[in-house]
A protein has these predicted regions:
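A structural signal for multi-pass alpha-helical bundles of membrane permease subunits
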Residues: 33-300
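Transmembrane alpha-helical segments of polytopic membrane transport and secretion proteins
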Residues: 1-41, 112-114, 294-300
Length: 300
């Protein structure tokens, strides 16, 4: 009589069957989760296609005519706008990030009054852009603004018309942008500083390292990657900053303080939709390399 196959729980056959059933069950469960995951992604994908991909594609299609770019490049305001944009981005980003790096070290202090200052420091970023920038515009009013009123009370002379001078107007636009966004980048770099082990600074102090040496050999090597990534992202956001210029100066005086983010509105007001779209397309060569470099940094 041939021997019968054992089917006890401890037998190898039973274990193999149980393992196969378990693997199939896990595979079935994984497939179910993947199916429902795709179902839940569909609404977001549709929203992205309808409200992002379609408008961008349609705008590029409308701006396809070479004549639009010929007329755009023939407009002297466009070249002034390009120069303004370069100045706005280079000055704002560098000042903002250097100040954020310095202030992130200051706010590491654990004293109670530093904590109060840190809470107050967040307010410009927490408050919406429109009231923040409009309040600065009211302060700069040449007739009843608080700045000119203070100048008159102290000197007996009328203050300048701040926003009627292109250089001053663009400078105050950069100041408004820095004031609004500086708290955010300070928080980012503060988080980076807090991630550095305190033991490294303690060991450096024992070795007699100065504050500058600690920054040079401990802080900066640990934060250089975060600083670079933050700078690239800040450049992208600064290129797209519409509120700081438009709400403060409206592109004036005489359309001399426009940046690429606001130039399209000028052409729309003149009923030149093709030039408005062309001015946006021209900004893409500035933005896309930054986005590409940013994605490469994040993928490492």
């Amino acid at each position: 009589m041939p021997p019968t196959m054992s089917s006890s729980p401890s037998s190898p056959t039973f274990t193999a069957v149980q393992t196969g059933v378990s693997v199939r069950a896990k595979a079935g469960g994984s497939s179910s989760w993947q199916f429902w995951g795709r179902i839940f992604v569909v609404p977001y994908l549709l929203i992205f296609l309808v409200f992002v991909i379609y408008p961008v594609g349609y705008g590029l299609w409308l701006a396809r005519h070479p004549d639009s770019y010929t007329r755009l490049f023939a407009d002297p305001i466009f070249f002034r706008t390009v120069i303004n944009t370069i100045i706005f981005v280079v000055v704002s980003v560098n000042l903002k990030m250097m100040l954020a790096l310095f202030l992130s070290g200051f706010f590491l202090n654990t004293r109670w009054w530093v904590k109060i200052l840190a809470a107050l420091f967040i307010l410009p970023w927490a408050v919406p852009s429109i009231p923040t920038i409009l309040s600065m515009r009211f302060m700069l009013n040449p007739e009843w603004g608080v700045i000119n009123s203070l100048i008159f009370n102290l000197t007996g002379r009328d203050g300048p018309n701040w926003l009627n001078d292109p250089t001053l107007a663009l400078s105050f636009s950069m100041l408004a942008h820095i004031w609004k966004s500086l708290p955010f980048w300070t928080l980012i770099l503060l988080a980076g500083r807090m991630s550095i082990p305190a033991e490294q600074y303690e060991a450096a102090s024992v070795d007699g390292a100065t504050t500058w040496q600690k920054f040079k050999f401990i802080t900066w090597p640990a934060m250089s990657g975060l600083y670079l990534t933050s700078t690239i992202l800040s450049m992208i956001w600064t290129l797209g900053d519409f509120n700081s210029v438009y709400l403060l100066t409206g592109g004036g005086p005489a359309d001399l303080t426009h940046v690429l983010a606001t130039l399209g509105i000028r052409y729309l007001r003149l009923d030149q939709v093709d030039l408005s779209l062309a001015s946006i397309v021209v900004a893409l060569p500035l933005v896309l390399p930054l986005v590409y470099f940013m994605m490469k940094r994040l993928s490492k």
